[in-house]
């Protein structure tokens, strides 16, 4: 990602990234730092945050890390407050943290799975977006919100029931916020990755046989898996002034899988 260093499109900006210690979130943190931004990386995994801080030590005080449970409203709101206190401002928030559901179709899903997915994948995005909009409105200078949805937020057969519902809701929230606040200089967009080489599926110890068969229809041989770096490049573009007239959009990054 060294090309970002030669094109510091986020110089002088401050970004908050949830799920920032691994996978797509970690790549976004690194990409944004290389593009000149200061970053607050938030994650539930303290060990991973410490490792991230050590790995990116060259950025010094431009990188702060904080343990956050994104399903907890106070944690999310405190995260934004910390960024403002540490860096003096917040210009960008990336609501990226998320979990999967073992590709469970509705008949195999219990209430606990549904409620957990909604808390982490949807409520967290609402908390972060609401806090950001309130801050941006008070500051009066606009701002950028990027929500990590999924191909499953556009194509209903690519994931489990709870995961798909949560990501469709993220897309709807994104578009509503974009329209409601377009006249304030606030931009709100979503990235929709397809299959990507991250650890989000680590918890899927026993994926549903039916769900797996249905969700992967049309995938075999159609395209390779994406890399976190390919997703973070799209996020950096949306965060920059180069995307200044892009608002309320869902940017699909899936190598063509959704064309099936």
Curated annotation (Swiss-Prot):
**Pfam families xrefs:** adh_short_C2
| Keyword NAD among UniProt keywords | yes
Q: Which family does it belong to?
A: Belongs to the short-chain dehydrogenases/reductases (SDR) family.
> Which first-to-last residue range defines the signal peptide?
none
- The enzyme's first-digit EC class, named in words, is oxidoreductase
Q: Which reaction does this chain catalyze?
A: 3-oxo-5beta-cholan-24-oate + NADH + H(+) = isolithocholate + NAD(+); 12alpha-hydroxy-3-oxo-5beta-cholan-24-oate + NADH + H(+) = isodeoxycholate + NAD(+); 12alpha-hydroxy-3-oxo-5beta-cholan-24-oate + NADPH + H(+) = isodeoxycholate + NADP(+); 7alpha,12alpha-dihydroxy-3-oxo-5beta-cholan-24-oate + NADH + H(+) = isocholate + NAD(+)
Entry keyword set = Lipid metabolism, NAD, Oxidoreductase, Steroid metabolism
| Amino-acid positions noted as binding NAD(+) in the UniProt annotation, renumbered to this chain | 43, 69-70, 96, 163, 167
Q: Does the keyword NAD apply?
A: yes
- The species this protein belongs to is Eggerthella lenta (strain ATCC 25559 / DSM 2243 / CCUG 17323 / JCM 9979 / KCTC 3265 / NCTC 11813 / VPI 0255 / 1899 B)
Q: Which protein are we looking at?
A: 3beta-hydroxysteroid dehydrogenase 2
The record's active-site residues are: 163
Q: Which GO terms describe its molecular function?
A: oxidoreductase activity, acting on the CH-OH group of donors, NAD or NADP as acceptor
GO biological process annotations for this chain's record? Answer: bile acid metabolic process
Q: What does this protein do?
A: Involved in the modification of secondary bile acids into iso-bile acids (3beta-bile acids) via epimerization of the 3-OH group through a 3-oxo-intermediate. Catalyzes the reduction of 12-alpha-hydroxy-3-oxo-5-beta-cholan-24-oate (3-oxo-DCA) and 3-oxo-5-beta-cholan-24-oate (3-oxo-LCA) to yield isodeoxycholate (isoDCA) and isolithocholate (isoLCA), respectively.
